[in-house]
């Protein structure tokens, strides 16, 4: 049988070529249009940021005083034996230099708040990406603030949430990182942060919740205290023990994941039964009249 050959009519071939060309042109137009919109969006965003920076930067507060950090401390009246008999002031705080803060307390805070604190320049771009991915499909957002950003916010800015305040926060963060060392920033954070029960800073919180100096806290106690910055009332081990316990266990796991503690230490910390202090009185001797007399003499 002789071979058969197929042929395409010239009109149909021309029509197919025209259709293909039209499709390609349509796709090119769509790509160019999308690219133009994205480019315009990026340019507009850069212009908005530039204007915001021009407005915000000259109005940034002077942070030179933080190089010699001296927070407000309560008036404490001690006996001749050094026993506390009276404390006056709205804020409980014990200023503790960074070198005197135990490593276990620092590790617990870094594990839950900012594990890359000593690596980033104030803003953790990895943290932003992780938070954005974690927030997809979640009703409740997950934050990405570094410790430096929290210092900038807690010391100088209001709690109001808007884009302008966020710009101020980021600018202040870079300014803090430029002027202060990492240890200085961490020292301010560890002493300044509110932790509930009128306690500011982890030294005061250790006394308020466990009735012991900060240098004596265990891994389990440090993990419990490290959960307080997120929400001091919600994770208060006195008023909300179940929620506090849940976060404490998570922090212990984070400490292990980041290499701060061994698996054996983590297991032991999870099993430790904490003795939480009930009551807000830190005085060992009740001599209120004497303490009040001293206060009046001091402010006379």
Task: Enumerate the predicted regions with their spans.
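Short, glycine-/polar-rich solvent-exposed loops and beta-turns at beta-strand/coil boundaries
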Residues: 68-69, 88-90, 121-127, 144-145, ...
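Terminal hydrophobic membrane-targeting helix
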Residues: 55-108
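N-terminal type II signal-anchor transmembrane helix
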Residues: 1-78, 116, 136
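Structural motif marking the loop-to-transmembrane transition
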Residues: 19-31, 35, 125, 144, ...
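Flexible, acidic/glycine-enriched loop-and-adjacent beta/alpha segments
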Residues: 97-147, 203-204, 210
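Non-catalytic, structured segments within soluble enzyme domains
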Residues: 138-300
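Short small-residue beta-strand/loop micro-motif enriched in glycine and branched aliphatics
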Residues: 85-87, 118, 233-236
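Flexible glycine-/small-residue-rich
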Residues: 77-79, 132, 227-229
């Amino acid at each position: 049988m002789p071979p058969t050959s197929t042929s395409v009519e010239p009109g149909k071939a021309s029509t197919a070529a025209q259709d293909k060309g039209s499709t390609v042109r349509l796709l090119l137009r769509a790509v160019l249009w999308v690219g133009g919109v994205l480019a315009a969006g990026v340019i507009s965003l850069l212009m908005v940021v530039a204007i915001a920076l021009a407005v915000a930067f000259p109005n940034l507060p002077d942070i030179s005083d933080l190089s010699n950090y001296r927070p407000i401390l309560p008036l404490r009246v001690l006996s001749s034996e050094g026993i506390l008999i009276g404390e006056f002031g709205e804020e409980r705080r014990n200023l503790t230099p960074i070198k005197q803060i135990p490593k276990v307390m620092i590790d617990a805070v870094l594990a839950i708040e900012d594990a890359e604190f000593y690596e980033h320049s104030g803003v953790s771009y990895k943290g932003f990406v992780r938070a954005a991915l974690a927030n997809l499909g979640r009703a409740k957002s997950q934050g990405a603030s570094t410790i430096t950003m929290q210092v900038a916010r807690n010391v100088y800015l209001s709690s109001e949430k808007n884009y302008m305040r966020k710009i101020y926060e980021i600018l202040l963060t870079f300014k803090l990182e430029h002027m202060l060392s990492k240890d200085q920033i961490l020292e301010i954070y560890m002493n300044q942060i509110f932790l509930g029960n009128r306690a500011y800073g982890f030294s005061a919180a250790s006394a308020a919740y466990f009735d012991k100096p900060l240098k004596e806290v265990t891994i389990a106690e440090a993990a419990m205290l490290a959960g307080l910055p997120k929400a001091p009332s919600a994770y208060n081990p006195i008023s909300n023990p179940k929620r506090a316990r849940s976060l404490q266990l998570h922090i212990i796991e984070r400490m292990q994941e980041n290499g701060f503690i061994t698996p054996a230490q983590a297991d032991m910390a999870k099993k430790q039964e904490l003795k939480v202090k009930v009551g807000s009185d830190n005085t060992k001797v009740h001599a209120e009249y004497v303490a009040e007399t001293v206060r009046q003499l001091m402010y006379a």
